[in-house]
UniProtKB/Swiss-Prot annotation:
CDD domains: HMG-box_SoxE (cd22031). This is Transcription factor Sox-9-B. One of its GO terms (cellular component) is cytoplasm. Residues 42-52, 211-220, 345-360, 452-476 have a biased composition (Polar residues). The keyword DNA-binding applies. GO terms for biological process: cartilage development; chondrocyte differentiation; gonadal mesoderm development; heart development; morphogenesis of an epithelium; negative regulation of transcription by RNA polymerase II; neural crest formation; oligodendrocyte differentiation. It comes from Xenopus laevis (African clawed frog). The gene is sox9-b. A motif (9aaTAD 2) lies at residues 291-299. Residues 105-173 bind DNA. Residues 30-41, 319-344, 369-383 have a biased composition (Low complexity). It is found in: Nucleus; Cytoplasm.
Amino acid sequence: MNLLDPFMKMSEEQDKCLSGAPSPTMSEDSAGSPCPSGSGSDTENTRPQENTFPKGDQEMKKETEDEKFPVCIREAVSQVLKGYDWTLVPMPVRVNGSSKNKPHVKRPMNAFMVWAQAARRKLADQYPHLHNAELSKTLGKLWRLLNEGEKRPFVEEAERLRVQHKKDHPDYKYQPRRRKSVKNGQSEQDDSAEQTHISPNAIFKALQADSPHSTSSMSEVHSPGEHSGQSQGPPTPPTTPKTDVQPGKPDLKREGRPLQESGRQPPHIDFRDVDIGELSSEVISTIETFDVNEFDQYLPPNGHPGVGSAQAPYTGSYGISSTPSATTGAGSAWMSKQQQQPQQHSLSTINSEQSQSQQRTHIKTEQLSPSHYSDQQQQHSPQQLNYSSFNLQHYSSSYPTITRAQYDYTEHQGSNSYYTHASGQNSGLYSNFTYMNPSQRPMYTPIADTTGVPSIPQTHSPQHWEQPVYTQLTRP
């Protein structure tokens, strides 16, 4: 507390000083005397203080700030520092608290600055209400209107200032300070631009089973109930011919990049809020119907020899998101619901080509007309559902024969939020299908039993998609 004793003395004397008017005739030993009676008395007053304090006044000031002394002590210190003649202490010049030894040297004024400075002072005195920015604009306009003769005195003054500046600061070098704020603003704008560029694709990541690019290379298509299983894009089976590549190029162009499967189940998106205009207008003719004739060019002329094709009623309104498909992908086996394990609530996939393990097995769908799967969960309204034929290719020869495999999709609604559509639908909506071995019927498998479906006319040339089948269902 030795350091604090002089401070306490100073504060007491300072209180006395503040109580009465400070005058130069105050006692000489009052260390905190704020008297402006000349440098000699000031130095005499303050030099005993230097002897008393083992540390310099500057360090004392730091200590007072660091240790948060009371207000009276701070005031006393400020009085001492104010009264001290700082020319006696050698110290580096500090500009804005920076540790540079050299003070900031301004550039010499050019001719316009000489003009603007003089004119601004004059105008500011005459018209104090003028705003400074408006004044600067007006001075700039006036400067451009001046002729060479009128500018000459300012040019000469600027030249004189430049020569004087060079004498005063012979080693002066102009070093402009970089403005970080502007670059930060630009980078923020760039970041926001990137975010706005990415955000539409976030929709397509959830919708990626809808757009026909997901059937590119006629490979596996992952319906939304199956997003959790795949961590990469749809793989191309080895049987894919090169004529089938990229049936969904219109939508790929719109998206700008192929969408990756997320490794986990994304949150359920209410696709009723998604603008269908973002999907391909070349692909979707209307919400209610879907025309598959335009994809004839992408299909091979005779299909795949030795590969089974099946025709299945498919939920129409090929709009926004996909239904659990009645067609399974790339050598996967059909199982009736009696064969399923009840806790899975989805068809397990037997994939002989890729054998990819899934976190939770879901329906593997293969969509060979590059049409959009429709989301039956949107069909709570009693509108009529359209059905189009689907041509299943790339089935391996291990395709089992299961007759009358019934699929009751009301059983699946507990496993995934995508199956909540099935609550309003009858279990007879997915009727009994007969799937035959490819060796028996290599080209085309008709629907054998149409008990749940009113009428499904069979197409005569399914490999060319000339007659898309539309079957209309009404809600029970």
